From Swiss-Prot:
The keyword Transcription belongs to this UniProt entry's keyword annotation: no
Alphabetized GO MF terms: aminomethyltransferase activity; transaminase activity
Annotated source species: Burkholderia mallei (strain ATCC 23344)
Identification of the protein by name: Aminomethyltransferase
Transferase is among the record's keywords: yes
Quaternary structure note: The glycine cleavage system is composed of four proteins: P, T, L and H.
Swiss-Prot/TrEMBL catalytic activity: N(6)-[(R)-S(8)-aminomethyldihydrolipoyl]-L-lysyl-[protein] + (6S)-5,6,7,8-tetrahydrofolate = N(6)-[(R)-dihydrolipoyl]-L-lysyl-[protein] + (6R)-5,10-methylene-5,6,7,8-tetrahydrofolate + NH4(+)
EC number: 2.1.2.10
Alphabetic keyword roster: Aminotransferase, Transferase
InterPro entries, alphabetized: GCS_T, GCS_T_bac, GCST_C, GCV_T_N, GcvT/YgfZ/DmdA, GcvT/YgfZ_C, TrmE/GcvT_dom1
Family according to the record: Belongs to the GcvT family.
Pfam families, alphabetized: GCV_T, GCV_T_C
One BP term from GO: glycine decarboxylation via glycine cleavage system
Length: 372
């Protein structure tokens, strides 16, 4: 029997009677009662997620910037202000996505990366290989002594400040995709980033694992609702945010996964995977779908791996769900390049081919429905 990994908040989840599931080898909460209410809490007020299964990795050394210029597809030349964050893909030489991650710049000798839970060991092995092969001489340190809490929603930042008043000065002026280090709080030294995976404002807080339960409980006392992986998935799907292993993997180019904006080909950098991307270019479109209704009712729910018939050939849904914010069935799909926004395609659901409308992503941002 496989023993599941647990986060430092495992006992807190159990105490809240969370429904736990195996998520990539981790015992994680899928919900604490009502997934819909958790979703709506984030869209209208404030919710929090335990994302401590994700791995913080610290990179130190004089050549850390040069390392990331080579290692990732986005360009760390964009990182000039301490605390600035960059979303990027980590590619293999064939241009496939090893992982998607966030890189934080703090000094010319210290960068921090947050990688996905299921790919952490693979990522770290790849980083070590690139470091050794390139002679960069970096120290690469996974930080399992940290936990991460994501507080998300229109009122999340204010409730974090109510909980950690000493963090307000360092974080009140933070722009999206920036972080600040806040020392000496009642919850230890924190890294507070204005980032998230929900399409709402908020903070992702890197906190010592020894202090995370106290932070979690303090946030809950101030009305930040615990939320599980179920709401996290519907929120990120509405927000048009990819899930690694579902919307892209090592066999998929970022150019075919709606992630061309994370690939910087403008500078003459020899980053891993560049030659393959330039040789193959984009071979598919990555679009949103909304299942059309007949007589006010949808004939099913869009789900991953359903086939999509178009006049230009077949595609496939990569992620799908019922959207609580839109009251519609929505999906991401990889389809032939000639499929255009506004087209009607047909999705195979059980024994029927049901019509769906092609829309531009995202579906929802900051509580507002964008896809009509």
């Amino acid at each position: 029997m496989t023993v599941l990994k647990t986060t430092p908040l495992h006992a807190a989840h159990r105490a809240l009677n969370a429904r736990m599931v195996d998520f990539g080898g981790w015992d994680m909460p899928v919900n604490y009662g009502s997934q819909i209410e958790e979703h709506q809490a984030v869209r209208t007020d404030a919710g929090m997620f335990d994302v401590s299964h994700m791995c913080v990795v610290d990179f130190t050394g004089p050549r850390v910037r040069a390392f990331f210029e080579h290692a990732i597809a986005n360009n760390v030349a964009k990182l000039q202000t301490p605390g600035k964050a960059l979303y990027s893909c980590l590619l293999n030489p064939q241009g496939g996505v090893i992982d998607d991650l966030i890189v934080y710049y703090f000094t010319e000798e210290f960068f921090r990366v947050v990688v996905n839970a299921g790919t952490a060991e693979k990522d770290i092995a790849w980083f070590n290989q690139l470091n050794e092969q390139g002679g960069f001489g970096l120290t690469i340190a996974p930080r399992r002594d940290f936990a991460i809490v994501a507080a998300q929603g229109p009122n999340a930042r204010a409730k974090v400040w109510d909980t950690v008043p000493c963090a307000r000065a360092a974080t009140s002026e933070l722009k999206p995709f920036n972080a600040a280090q806040v020392a000496g709080t009642p919850f230890g030294d924190l890294t507070v980033a204005r980032t998230g995976y929900t399409g709402e404002d908020g903070f992702e807080i890197i906190v010592p694992a020894t202090h995370v339960e106290a932070l979690w409980n303090a946030l809950a006392e101030r009305g930040v609702r615990p939320c599980g992986l179920g709401a996290r998935d519907t929120l990120r799907l509405e927000a048009g945010m990819n899930l690694y292993g579902q919307d892209m993997d090592e066999s998929v180019s970022p150019l075919d996964a709606g992630l061309a904006w994370t690939v910087d080909l403008s500078a003459p950098r020899a980053f891993v995977g560049r030659d393959a991307l330039e040789a193959h270019g984009s071979r598919a479109a990555f679009v949103g779908l909304i299942l059309q209704k007949e007589n006010g009712r949808a004939g099913g729910v869009l789900r991953a791996h359903q086939k999509v018939a178009t006049p230009h050939g077949e595609g496939e849904i990569t992620s799908g769900t019922f959207s609580p914010s839109m009251q519609e069935s929505i999906a991401f799909a990889r389809v032939p390049k000639d499929v255009a926004i506004g087209d009607t395609v047909h999705v195979q659901i059980r024994d029927k081919q049901l019509p769906a409308r092609v829309v531009k992503l995202p579906f929802v941002r900051n509580g507002k429905v964008l896809a009509a």
